[in-house]
From Swiss-Prot:
This is Sec-independent protein translocase protein TatB. GO terms for biological process: protein transport by the Tat complex. Belongs to the TatB family. Pfam families: TatA_B_E (PF02416). It is a single-pass membrane protein. InterPro entries: TatA/B/E, TatB. GO terms for molecular function: protein transmembrane transporter activity. It comes from Albidiferax ferrireducens (strain ATCC BAA-621 / DSM 15236 / T118). Its main location: membrane.
Length: 154
């Protein structure tokens, strides 16, 4: 942009005050300000338009590269599918030529799980044993003595 310092602006303002006069100077400054604002907006719009067109060109190039990559991938998939179908046809033709063996695997033998269903049905539930005071765990003699020994009073 134009390099105008404060001293140059003061000199231009002084000359404009002498030439135009103090009555018309504020109106002239206002018009110059609006014209400069319009010029800046116009330049910014032109820059934006140029940037947009450049971005569109880049996007078109990217689109073309992606489309070519998709075409290449599609072609490779088609060729691999054709190769696979050819190999499959060859393999099935060879398998059809070989005699068929009468091999039938024996089914697995049934093994009973050995669950003690009747014992479980006849068993008394633990919650009932706890309520009735039935002992479910055996204590050793030493453990029983230690459990029922009276506490020492200090």
């Amino acid at each position: 942009m134009i390099d105008i310092g404060i001293t140059k602006l003061a000199i231009i303002g002084g000359i404009a005050l002498i030439v135009i006069g103090p009555e018309k100077l504020p109106g002239l400054a206002k018009t110059i300000g609006t014209l400069l604002g319009r010029a800046r907006r116009y330049v910014a719009d032109v820059k934006d338009e140029v940037n947009r067109s450049m971005d569109l060109d880049e996007l078109k190039k990217m689109k073309d590269t992606v489309e070519s990559a998709v075409r290449d991938v599609d072609n490779t998939i088609q060729t691999s599918a054709a190769d696979f179908e050819k190999n499959w046809a060859d393999a099935t033709a060879q398998a059809a030529d070989t005699p068929f063996n009468d091999f039938s695997p024996t089914p697995p033998a049934y093994r009973h799980p050995n669950k003690k269903w009747r014992v479980k049905q006849g068993a008394t539930p633990n919650w009932y044993k706890a309520r009735a005071g039935i002992r479910t765990r055996a204590l050793s003699g030493a453990a029983r003595v230690a459990r029922f020994r009276p506490h020492k009073v200090n």
